[in-house]
Amino acid sequence: MPLHVEILSTGDELLTGQVVDTNSTWLMDRLWDLGVMVRRKTLVGDDRADLDAALRETSGRSDLVVVSGGMGPTEDDLTSERVAAVLGVPLELHEPSLRALEERFRKFGRAMTPNNEKQARFPRGAEVIPNRFGSAPGFAVRIGRAEVVCFPGVPVEYRGLADEWLLPRVAARLGEVPASRLLKLFAVPESHADHAMRPVMDDPANEGVRFGFRAHWPEVHVKWTVPGPGADARAARIAAAVRGIFGDAVFGEAKEELPALVVARLAARGERVALAESCTGGLLAELVTGVPGASAVIDLGVVAYANAMKEAVLGVPAPLLAAHGAVSEPVARALAEGARRAGRATWGLGITGIAGPTGGTPEKPVGTVHVALAGPGGTTAVERLYRGDRERIRKTAAFEALNLLRLALR
């Protein structure tokens, strides 16, 4: 029998759009790795009647209900209270949780106000789940057919408790855990990925395998979950097939990120990169330096927006700019070579383009971007025409530069 799981997320801030419920999407992804697809997700505000109704409805049709939020010390934190009301039991003080809470306040040198005691009160009979990630413990009860698990809504606490307590419990309940794999593709449209994967997905040998695609442009993630005996071997065969279909477009697996991958490859080779950016305005440098250990591979990053700075700082010849314009392949090449020279680096990356929303022409419309890579074997360049708003164009251009370097570092 499949495990019927629902997620119940609480808080007015979720319904007003002030906070995005990332906890639910994270948990859905982790449960999918176990072969469990969440059947429903419900959002409910800080209203007693609505919470009571949602708890009764979800617990009446599911095996497991995961509740987030409403576990804090304030007046609008209602989860423990409403679970107790639905069960028809009182709230009781859990002394170990109270002592842990008092110790936490002492540790941080803060006075504990009386309302914080609320975080140590749970419905009678609840299983209390200690929280080493924050102040409010979680708890689990049974309402009707369902196990109802309640966690704080703070993401680091919610995810920590789910990883340590909930997911192992679900895995044990399922018995045999399926094998899940994820490969990341660069700049392959989701529809193209789906079409290219049809022979794999329609293969009778892959019957029962659950495939999924997620666009996180300029990345597309291909994921599959294989049930039953020999799941690991079957998942590995699918991975080989996916790599065969997409070739160099595959840049990483589940937790690999393109900036970190590029930094790691540079470090392993003892090489360095220098950056020259125009339309991306330092976004490429931010991606690289956001990786721990990036100081081992980068000394220089320049944002040369004005033509005068392209000439003065990076040595782009004025006649080249006059002849071709700042947004052109020759200038992108000169930027990359100038960065490599100025940074005394193994590699130089140059980006120039029109991010919009204004500045485009019929010959060079908004979204026109030139990216160049200068290296020991010479300089290569690509021209792209990106769609989307300014933010999307700039982001895609920065990742395009990283991908160009990744391919050179194979």
From Swiss-Prot:
A Pfam family matched in the record: MoCF_biosynth
Disulfide bonds: none
Domain of life: Bacteria
Stored SUPFAM superfamilies: CinA-like, Molybdenum cofactor biosynthesis proteins
Family classification: Belongs to the CinA family.
Name of the protein: CinA-like protein
Organism: Anaeromyxobacter sp. (strain Fw109-5)
